[in-house]
Every structure is written in C-alpha cells, then in structure tokens.
Amino acid sequence: MANTPSAKKRAKQAEKRRSHNASLRSMVRTYIKNVVKAIDAKDAEKAQAAYVLAVPVIDRMADKGIIHKNKAARHKGRLNGHIKALKEAAAA
C-alpha cells in the first residue's frame, strides 16, 4: 500500500487510467467482433461496412498506445483478407 501522498495519488491515477484503457480495449474488441460476425454470416456488404467503421477506431487505439501498432496492423490485414476472400467466393 502507498505510504506517501504522492504515491497514493499515483496509485489513484494508475487505477483510473487502467479502467479507462480497459474500456477502450473493450471497444476495439467490439468493433472487431462486429466485422467477424458479418464475415461468419457470409455477408460481404455488412462486413465491409463494419470494417470501414472499425479501421479508424483500431488506428486511434494504436496511436494512443492502447494496443500495439503491429497488433492493429495484424487485425486490419486479417479482417481485410477475410472480406476479400468472401467477396471472391461470392463472385465465383
């Protein structure tokens, strides 16, 4: 437990940041989940629309350091790959 006033303040700030960051991470996961649901439903239009909404959110969280930039790029690349495969399957 923190003893000095400054340590108590830092602990309080850390807890506040932790809960805020957890909320932001949850939001990113929700956007990703919406894209995945549309892909699983084989709905290319809905998946593309959800992807367009998810990309700026993923990028913003990467810029803020909530998720690593490489993780953000990996998510975007994989989701986009799945959507492209879905469109190609629908076209074929």
Curated annotation (Swiss-Prot):
Residues 7-20 have a biased composition (Basic residues). Keywords: Ribonucleoprotein, Ribosomal protein, RNA-binding, rRNA-binding. GO terms for biological process: translation. The keyword Transmembrane helix does not apply. One of its GO terms (cellular component) is cytosol. One of its GO terms (molecular function) is structural constituent of ribosome. It comes from the Bacteria. Residues 1-23 are annotated as: Disordered. Belongs to the bacterial ribosomal protein bS20 family. Binds directly to 16S ribosomal RNA. This is Small ribosomal subunit protein bS20. It comes from Pseudomonas putida (strain ATCC 47054 / DSM 6125 / CFBP 8728 / NCIMB 11950 / KT2440). The gene is rpsT.
